Amino acid sequence: MDVGEHGQLGGGPTRVDTGQGGCRAYGSLYRYSGAMGNEVQGRARMTLAEVAASCGVSRMTVSNAYSRPDQLSAELRQRVLATAEQLGYGGPSAAGRALKRGRSDVLGVLLTEALPYAFGDPGTVSFLHGVTAATAAAGLALQLIPASAGIAERLVRDAAVDGLIAHSPADDDPALAAALRRRLPTVISGGPSTAGADCVTVDNEAAAAGAARHLIELGHHQLGVVTWRLHPDGYTGQVDQARQDSARYEVFRLRLLGYQRAAAAAGLPPAAVRVWEQPGHSVADGCAAGHALLSVPDHERPTAVLASTDVLALGVLQAARELGRSVPRDLSVAGYDDIEESARALPPLTTVHQSLYQQGQDCARRLITPGTAPARLHPTRLIVRASTAPPPEWP
């Protein structure tokens, strides 16, 4: 039977002599006519049933040759595997095995960025390192699901995983919602507390307040804040209170709230804390924000800048150098995360320490051994280094 215009399976069975004890294979040929009219011929994927027929054994025998070798004699197993190899059969499909066992032995990680970002961002790399440490110890595989080209929701819906870790999702992330609709065991890291999902996090508000309090106690009364995106709309610029309050990323909403509450508790007016938002998360983004906050008249210029991540804080340090401002003599800078680069910065960066590695490890453990993993709330601590000091006018 010939194929149609767009290519169809067709033709009668073709007999293949494998030379293995008289085994015979019957595989369907297919022909495909591509868009340019070029016809391609090949063999459809060999099935377990065809291998069984070739060897004159049951399908269960072929399946056992792969998954339960102790059920067969060594000679029979070798004959089945050799025949399968010659026929081009690669073994039972992973999807089929997972369906039969009721599990895939795979955990998924839902990322809020594309994969190139995930592999280049120090905090995400540390988090994934912790996840893989736990999955490797448990003999599980890992599937990364990136938020690229708007396809994450479909990928989550179709993913053959036993559980999902959602890393810093937005409050209304559609991919996270898809996982919960599937009733997929889910742990959220750095995101909203959500019905139907477990969580692993830190007290972002209290930790940020501690960093702001440190600067205020040094004598800083004019603060700048650099934050990563609050909404996925690409906005760059100064942030008003309404935009802060409606932020869709819980981590940064809470960190801003901590900075502001510490300032208010010290009697500083709202105007004393100027917030600048960057849609991207890189040293270059932090540098751009630093230029925006520092290139203003003296009476508006902050004497200290709080960055919601260390990556952005490193950019602020770069901006200060480019503007000829000495840190900490002219400007104090504090970050958040305590990535490895923060201790090597010039000067070394004051920051809030959190173990992203441990959080990643515990997210995976909560899925691997539900109910026996460590506490959901992880500790933080302020690490004071050489990037913060009293302001120039402080006695």
Please tell me what each predicted stretch does.
Residues S58, D105, D162, H220-Q222, ...:
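Short acidic/polar active-site loop segments enriched in Thr and Asp
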Residues E5, G11-R103, P395:
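N-terminal helix-turn-helix DNA-binding module of bacterial transcription factors
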Residues Q8-G10, G21, C287, H291-P395:
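Flexible loop/turn connectors
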Residues A170-A206, W228-G237, D337-L349:
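Flexible loop/hinge segments that line or gate small-molecule binding clefts
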Residues A53, K100, V156-R157, L180, ...:
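Non-catalytic positions within long, well-ordered alpha-helices that form the structural scaffold/packing
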Residues A114-V125, A147-I151, V200-A207, V225-A264, ...:
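Hinge/beta->alpha junction and helix N-cap segments in small-molecule ligand-binding domains
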Residues Q78, A82, G90-L155, G163:
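Amphipathic helical "hinge" segments at domain boundaries
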